[in-house]
């Protein structure tokens, strides 16, 4: 029993017309054009050498150590995400990766397309998803929530790249959610639709923040946002721009989303933050206070919430936005936001006197910082 020598390896490869150049890790191999389809990888060359020497001369021994196979963190997170979307009412769809050339003619063309309509690799999903929603609504399925995890193909810096993305569309309320709307299918507003997406993504426990959209022309500029993961732009969410739906009478309100899968899953698996953490259960109740303010529309809700958390760090446990009221009788630049503030002390039950001063100082800080006015 022995290992193959370098001379035996080079001799067999040269026998089939390969040209070899010695490098630091072994050889660089040039393959004849007529063998380029079957000799693409290192394992193909190994199989060819074994064939020429004779399979019967090799020792039939299984490599050690043998370890059971398992899913990678990326695969586990992807499956977890898929199940979460399905559990939250979304339907998974599958669309062609081949599409027709767009008006900008910046899609990657394939060399020998069967038909003109399938001559390029897709660079986005939203065109096909709009068609799916349109077909469902025309078929009587008024509430259509879909998602798809797949690859897009882009040309960046004169180099073709492949990126995995999470995409989807949300239109109207699902049938099982119509019990409180007298059986009528009504459109979701921006915040409700964004909440549905956030609920589906919460399984990975990754913080996703929004900033105003200034890039994606197929989205409504005032009802869309760029999604940030760990400070990096990683996708978008928003209502489709009316110009995209010109001539379409079946779709009223439609929200699209696209998220870079690598950025999302890397953020979740790097520290395994999607793995549940156990904490001590709070044995004392919290005190909740609802507070409403009139803000200028230029202020972003996330900035307001971050300011509240920054001002009070000791007793303030949670801040959530519970209501938005845009009264047409108010000034065009003003909007009412209502927040719910939860206070809790881990060691004792809070009394009204414990939080009254803190709560009042918080209100004054918000009014000063954002030039807002509390509504009572």
Q: Where would I find each of the regions flagged by the language model?
A:
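Short, structured patches in soluble enzyme cores that scaffold and shape functional sites
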Residues: 31-33, 112-114, 151, 170-172, ...
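Short glycine/proline-enriched turns and hinge-like loops at secondary-structure junctions
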Residues: 40-41, 104, 121, 140-143, ...
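Conserved alpha/beta core surface patches that mediate binding of polyanionic ligands
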Residues: 2-16, 44-47, 92-93, 123-171, ...
């Amino acid at each position: 029993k022995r290992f193959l020598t370098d001379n035996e390896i080079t001799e067999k490869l040269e026998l089939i017309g390969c040209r070899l150049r010695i490098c630091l890790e072994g050889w660089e191999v040039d393959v004849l054009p007529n063998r380029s389809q079957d000799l693409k990888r290192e394992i193909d060359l190994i199989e060819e050498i074994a064939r020429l020497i004779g399979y019967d001369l090799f020792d039939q021994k299984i490599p050690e150590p043998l370890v059971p196979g398992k899913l990678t963190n990326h695969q586990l997170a992807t499956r977890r995400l898929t199940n979460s979307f399905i559990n939250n009412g979304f339907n998974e769809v599958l669309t062609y990766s081949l599409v027709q050339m767009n008006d900008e003619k910046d899609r990657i063309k394939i060399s020998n397309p069967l038909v003109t309509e399938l001559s390029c690799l897709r660079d986005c999903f939203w065109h096909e998803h709009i068609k799916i929603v349109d077909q469902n609504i025309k078929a009587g399925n008024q509430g259509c929530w879909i998602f798809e995890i797949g690859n897009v193909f882009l040309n960046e810096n004169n180099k073709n790249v492949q990126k995995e993305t999470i995409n989807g569309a949300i239109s109207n309320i699902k049938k099982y959610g119509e019990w409180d709307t007298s059986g009528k299918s009504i459109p979701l507003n921006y915040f409700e639709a964004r909440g549905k997406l956030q609920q589906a993504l919460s399984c990975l426990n990754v913080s996703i923040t929004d900033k105003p959209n200034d890039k994606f022309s197929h989205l409504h500029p005032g009802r869309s946002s760029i999604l940030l993961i760990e400070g990096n732009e990683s996708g978008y969410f928003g209502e489709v721009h009316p110009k995209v739906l010109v001539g379409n009478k079946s779709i009223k309100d439609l929200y699209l989303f696209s998220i870079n899968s690598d950025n999302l899953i890397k953020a979740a698996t790097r520290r395994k933050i999607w793995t549940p953490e156990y904490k001590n259960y709070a044995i004392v109740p919290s005190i909740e206070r609802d507070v409403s303010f009139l803000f200028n529309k230029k202020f972003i809700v996330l900035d307001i919430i971050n300011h509240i958390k920054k001002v009070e760090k000791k007793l303030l446990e949670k801040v959530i936005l519970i209501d938005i009221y845009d009264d047409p009788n108010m000034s065009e630049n003003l909007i009412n936001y209502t927040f719910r503030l939860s206070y809790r002390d881990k060691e004792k039950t809070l009394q009204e006197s414990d939080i009254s001063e803190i709560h009042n100082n918080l209100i004054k800080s918000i009014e000063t910082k954002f030039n807002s006015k509390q509504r009572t």
